[in-house]
Curated annotation (Swiss-Prot):
A Gene Ontology biological process term: maintenance of translational fidelity
InterPro entries xref list: L3_arc_euk, Ribosomal_L3_dom_3_arc_sf, Ribosomal_uL3, Ribosomal_uL3_CS, Transl_B-barrel_sf
Subcellular locations according to the entry: Cytoplasm
Residue ranges the record marks as coiled coil: none
Protein name: Large ribosomal subunit protein uL3
Gene: RPL3
Primary location group: cytoplasm
Highest rank taxon of the organism: Eukaryota
Keyword Ribonucleoprotein: yes
Family per similarity comment: Belongs to the universal ribosomal protein uL3 family.
Pfam families recorded: Ribosomal_L3 (PF00297)
Keywords: Cytoplasm, Ribonucleoprotein, Ribosomal protein
Taxonomic source organism: Debaryomyces hansenii (strain ATCC 36239 / CBS 767 / BCRC 21394 / JCM 1990 / NBRC 0083 / IGC 2968)
Length: 389
């Protein structure tokens, strides 16, 4: 019988404790990129809905690598990003204890889908949210202008309140997601003027992100419920003849201190945690309404980004979309927050110019053989179900 080790590295990271369910379904952003006043005014983040994943083929542009100028196959994620609607602006002042909210100015009219966010039960409510606030505009708007002037005078950070247009997605939910997004570039006065000009107007994703940019994605991961210690922490299974179970921790601590330490791996909630995945390269920013949104210079097939039959458990993307490298946290239909990278990545992977050669649009349900309905019809001919009865 071989000997056993006396010491071993611990299983699982303690850096993500507590491993409990996230309090909010939307990915929260606590930090934004550094403000550069010489750049034009623009948003630093965007909201979208995870639609699904696909496969892309491209030539690797990495001199010195054995795969340089050779085809590689990569996984990519499609995020449905309908335009955001700006409905407010918030000013923050710097204090010794950090940023403090100075005041918030809302737009005159708010749509029903965002007003639903302020009610737990919209059907039984009186639906009077923001009716008194809108009266400030009905008078002369002087009070609103005074609040905007306060932000220009005292604030050092300006963020806008923007909500998604969830009615443009295949989701059954009617309540839009609302978020604060920092505005960078220009002076504080320029930021406030930009926010006021965009009240009740839409901002598209192509005005925030561009191709080959590095972004971070904040979202809530897929939930797995109550899981055992072996799956939750990756601890080693015990030998076959172990009494009272194998997928357990044999020793959960010494006699004294007479309690279980917080560092000991235990069973509990796994998944549905808030996570931020950094450094995803933007492969494409396009519109699903474009009939060639899924085509490339190499593949001239007239097809959209949607696979045949739509994305499984999501449907068809009908708005602007982003194609990101790799996988991102969350399940399909989950709201995700996409933010500009906090630092400038100068690695070759980040600065590489990506030219996609092929985007897979075959059915994601089963083993898809055809890229377009026309290709399927050309191969199978007219099917019996398509004939007029």
């Amino acid at each position: 019988m071989s000997h056993r080790k006396y010491e071993a590295p611990r299983h699982g990271s303690l850096g993500f404790l507590p491993r409990k369910r996230s309090a909010n379904i939307r990915g929260r952003v606590k930090s934004f990129p550094k403000d550069v006043k010489s750049k034009p005014v623009a948003l630093t983040a965007f909201l979208g809905y995870k639609a699904g994943m696909t496969t892309v083929v491209r030539d690797l542009d990495r001199p010195g690598s054995k795969m340089h100028k050779r085809e590689i196959v990569e996984a990519a994620t499609v995020v449905d990003t309908p335009p955001l609607v700006v409905v407010g602006v918030v000013g923050y002042v710097e204090t010794p204890r950090g940023l403090r909210s100075l005041t918030t100015v809302w737009a005159e009219h708010l749509s029903e889908e965002v007003r639903r966010r302020f009610y737990k039960n919209w059907y039984k409510s009186k639906k009077k949210a923001f009716t008194k606030y809108s009266a400030k505009y009905a008078q002369d708007g002087a009070q609103v202008e005074r609040e905007l002037a306060r932000i220009k005078k005292y604030a050092s950070v300006v963020r806008v309140l923007a909500h998604t247009q969830i009615k443009k997605t295949p989701l059954a939910q009617k309540k839009a997601h609302l978020a604060e997004i920092q505005v960078n570039g220009g002076s504080v006065s320029d930021k406030v003027d930009w926010a006021k000009e965009h009240f009740e107007k839409t901002v598209s994703v192509d005005s925030v992100f561009e191709k080959d940019e590095m972004v971070d994605v904040a979202a809530v991961t897929k939930g797995h419920g109550f899981e055992g210690v072996t799956h939750r922490w990756g601890t080693k299974k015990l030998p076959r003849k172990t009494h009272r179970g194998l997928r357990k921790v044999a020793c959960i601590g010494a006699w004294h201190p007479a309690n279980v330490q917080w560092t000991v791996a235990r069973a509990g909630q796994n998944g549905f945690h808030h996570r931020t995945s950094i450094n995803h390269k933007v492969y494409r920013v396009g519109s699903a309404g474009d009939e060639s949104s899924g085509a490339t210079e190499f593949d001239r097939t007239k097809k959209t980004i949607n696979p045949m039959g739509g994305f499984v458990r999501y449907g068809n993307v009908k708005n602007d979309f982003m194609l990101l490298k790799g996988s991102i946290p969350g399940v399909k239909k989950r709201i995700v927050t996409i933010r500009k990278s906090l630092y400038v990545d100068t690695s070759r992977r980040a600065t590489e110019n990506v030219n996609l050669k092929w985007i897979d649009t075959a059915s994601k349900f089963g083993k898809g053989r055809f890229q377009t309905p026309a290709e399927k019809h050309a191969f199978l001919g007219t099917l019996k179900k398509d004939l007029e009865k």
